[in-house]
């Protein structure tokens, strides 16, 4: 009999008990000493809610839009690689859950299901593609063309990964894909991270990135990508106001404030703490989103109050997959949705339009752990 899980932490604890250690460690871990990993979550507690009273919250409307597309709630699924390690259906289960709830899914380029397979599994789902810039630009171009062909609505280009962060658990575990899996969007065994290939004795993924991803990428490559497609493009991994302004200058359509789940450079700020700087920098010219550390409905409310249009969740989704596949993902999203609805109501917000910065203040006594 399956246990009763009622919050995101419950799902993680269950996943830890059922997933192979190397797979759980891959999903859970951050870079180096994991200071930023802890701070991504802890930082939300430094921001306190100041609710409004007597605002008639008998009915609440959670719906909003992301890059012009309607979603049932400002909680979307972020790019999480290789989801079939958590459940046999992987990304297909995730997109079906998103379709059921009316929210969006960002598909990782490193998915264990292809762009086409995910589109076929969730034909009515709002889908976006996360993109890396490969040394072979034709590989990148092909991914973009596949996304366009299959009805994906935007490209989220990752800008924080010229090399892979130093993830100690992956080094200790000599992380590789299980033998039956590969990255399905690539044809060659090297690009598909096939277990048949030799990726060394440390983190296989770090070796993969060193072989395949271009560390020389610059704003010139963003210009190239902007010319390549008419789809909206969002810069994923921005943590500075000047970089955000540069992204706007280069014609990008959004900023995803992200530290890659604290998996790249340890010691960077929690995303919720830098969100106000990014929002101020773009001056309303593009939409701003956030990922990193979102585990509760109050986290969503705080992010929106500080200017995010929506948040993206990653690890909670794979914990849901590990529990019960599509139903597990749906349950995780339903929990976050209901927690967010309750937080809105208890803060006097009938809809997301009335959520603003007057709802939150940073605790003056709080000190970052970094």
Swiss-Prot record:
The modification N6-succinyllysine is found at residue 184. Its cofactor is FMN. Its EC number is 1.1.3.15, 1.2.3.5. The keyword Amino-acid biosynthesis applies. One of its GO terms (cellular component) is intracellular membrane-bounded organelle. Glyoxylate binds at residues 26, 132, 167, 260, 263. Belongs to the FMN-dependent alpha-hydroxy acid dehydrogenase family. PANTHER family: 2-HYDROXYACID OXIDASE 1, S -2-HYDROXY-ACID OXIDASE-RELATED. This is 2-Hydroxyacid oxidase 1. It comes from Homo sapiens (Human).
